[in-house]
Curated annotation (Swiss-Prot):
Taxonomic lineage: Bacteria, Bacillati, Bacillota, Clostridia, Eubacteriales
Keyword match Cell membrane: yes
Superkingdom of this protein's organism: Bacteria
GO MF annotations, alphabetized: ATP binding; proton-transporting ATP synthase activity, rotational mechanism
Membrane protein topology class: Peripheral membrane protein
PANTHER family for this protein: ATP SYNTHASE DELTA/EPSILON CHAIN, ATP SYNTHASE EPSILON CHAIN, CHLOROPLASTIC
Family: Belongs to the ATPase epsilon chain family.
Gene3D superfamilies, A to Z: ATP synthase delta/epsilon subunit, C-terminal domain, F0F1 ATP synthase delta/epsilon subunit, N-terminal
Official protein name in the record: ATP synthase epsilon chain
Amino acid sequence: MNKFKLIVTTPERVLISGEVSRVLCKNAVGEFEILAGHQPYLTATVPTVTRIDDENGESKYLFTSTGLMKVQNNEVTFCVNSAEWPEEIDEARAMNAKQRAEERLKNKTDELDEKRAKLALARAMSRLKLKEM
């Protein structure tokens, strides 16, 4: 199986740095897949559950938030604001964040408030989705 190097980093830590066979993620346009030999690519990511298939084809799932993903020279680098493995997610905290975001969307006062609330809701929903997997 063809493989490539994957690095997922946040301002606080590196979550993964190793060989993988496939990555499935999401940007504002929709889902995308990265395989070995992918053409150079740069995109902004959105909060989602990112799927990582290791060199043996086994899947791991990771919450990734907003940030950038770069593909170059058979290496994929995620620089995201936050990322968490399923066991690191505080389900109660994510549920509270979801409820707060939904309340802010109901009582929005301006466009900036709405954008922030939608982003917070997307983060919370992605964390909860990963926790349920």
